[in-house]
């Protein structure tokens, strides 16, 4: 199709190879051309964006992947959205496969809910809609004053399991922590496999029960209202590491939404190996892999790490052959087509469960 006639354009919000590659895959599936723009850093460190064609009255889709430099990527997206708004684009839709700061969506001690701040900034910059994938918390959608389509990668990962893992019927789906149990259960039910949960010291410590905002004064200076006796709480203590479920002689498939702490996945894999699992896979939507991740994965009992291309990880993939990529440009391009044409998005959620 001809993008100029249909009234929409697709732009890449930065010039990194990964973002440009994803944008090109999407435009090829749509039969459109990538919008002409220039995004670069000034010598003083400022980000500059120049739109090189008319966008007046068109639907504009901005593709932005999030590399290691998160803050620069956010500024690129904000400045490009504002430039398109100034150029009289009709609608500005951000295609952000991995939404940054999604782990800061709850109050922690004397911190802030940064994810809500970012949502407000995007709206102020001119975005009118967002397409993203597997938000860390579904409640994040409520931070926005415009529509958010939270697509899911589970159908692609389930297909990978069925087609690329030999003898997957002998596998068991594993939750790395009780927090991930619902997601793991959803995978296990659709694949008709068993379920195991790792509980104990290897679990994620994202929920911090010690909230510093309620720190009491020193006992000698404290004044207690007469008759007020607060119940005493037992100190939080992790139990010894335990695997709930049988993984002996089985293939263990650990599923989660984000891999950003490789050490915890390696620890989980070592535990599963000790319990008798003969092959271990790790699967997640977003692979936020550090510079040390390839070495840690290569030296671990993990046989394969499978992630989608929502986050750039080509360099890490070259360093570690265990890292595999699942392309999700198909669902992103279909979402763009449906939104532009005013079609229902229900088809994209037909195989999705509430726990995905």
From Swiss-Prot:
The modification N-acetylmethionine is found at residue 1. The modification Phosphoserine is found at residues 177, 215. One of its GO terms (biological process) is purine nucleotide biosynthetic process. It comes from the Eukaryota. Transmembrane segments: none annotated. It holds the Pfam family Pribosyltran_N. Ubiquitous. The keyword Acetylation applies. The keyword Zinc does not apply. GO terms for molecular function: enzyme regulator activity; identical protein binding; kinase binding; magnesium ion binding. GO terms for cellular component: cytoplasm; protein-containing complex; ribose phosphate diphosphokinase complex. Keywords: Acetylation, Nucleotide biosynthesis, Phosphoprotein. InterPro entries: Pribosyltran_N (IPR029099), PRibTrfase_dom (IPR000836), PRTase-like (IPR029057), Rib-P_diPkinase (IPR005946). CDD domains: PRTases_typeI. Belongs to the ribose-phosphate pyrophosphokinase family. Seems to play a negative regulatory role in 5-phosphoribose 1-diphosphate synthesis. Binds to PRPS1 and PRPS2. PANTHER family: PHOSPHORIBOSYL PYROPHOSPHATE SYNTHASE-ASSOCIATED PROTEIN 1, RIBOSE-PHOSPHATE DIPHOSPHOKINASE FAMILY MEMBER. This is Phosphoribosyl pyrophosphate synthase-associated protein 1. The gene is Prpsap1.
């Amino acid at each position: 199709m001809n993008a100029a006639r249909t009234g929409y354009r697709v732009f890449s919000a930065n010039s990194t190879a990964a973002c440009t590659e994803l944008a090109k895959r999407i435009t090829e599936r749509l039969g459109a051309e990538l919008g002409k723009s220039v995004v670069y850093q000034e010598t003083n460190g400022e980000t500059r964006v120049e739109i090189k064609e008319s966008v007046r009255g068109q639907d504009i889709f901005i593709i932005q992947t999030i590399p290691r430099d998160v803050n620069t990527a956010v500024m690129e997206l904000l400045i490009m959205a504002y430039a398109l708004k100034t150029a009289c684009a009709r609608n500005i839709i951000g295609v952000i496969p991995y939404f940054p700061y999604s782990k800061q969506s709850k109050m922690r001690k004397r911190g802030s809910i940064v994810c809500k701040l970012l949502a407000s900034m995007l709206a102020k910059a001119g975005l009118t809609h967002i397409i993203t994938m597997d938000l860390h918390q579904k409640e994040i959608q409520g931070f926005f004053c415009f529509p958010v389509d939270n697509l899911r990668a589970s159908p692609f990962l389930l297909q990978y399991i069925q087609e690329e893992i030999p003898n997957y019927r002998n596998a068991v789906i594993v939750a790395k922590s009780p927090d991930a149990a619902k997601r793991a259960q959803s995978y296990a039910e659709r694949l008709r496999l068993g379920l195991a949960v790792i509980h104990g010291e290897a679990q994620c410590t994202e929920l911090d029960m010690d909230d510093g905002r309620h720190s009491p004064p020193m006992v000698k200076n404290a004044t207690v209202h007469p008759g007020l006796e607060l119940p005493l709480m037992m100190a939080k203590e992790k139990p010894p590491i335990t695997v709930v479920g049988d993984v002996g002689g089985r293939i263990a498939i650990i599923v989660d939404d984000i891999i950003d702490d490789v050490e915890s996945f390696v620890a989980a894999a070592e535990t599963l190996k000790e319990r008798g699992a003969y092959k271990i896979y790790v699967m997640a939507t977003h692979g936020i892999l550090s510079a040390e991740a390839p070495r840690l994965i290569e030296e671990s009992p993990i046989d394969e790490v499978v992630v989608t291309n929502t986050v750039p990880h080509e360099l890490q993939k070259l360093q570690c052959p265990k890292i595999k990529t699942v392309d999700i440009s198909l669902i992103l391009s279909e979402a763009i087509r449906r939104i532009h044409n005013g079609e229902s998005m229900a088809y994209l959620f037909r195989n999705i469960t509430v726990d995905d």
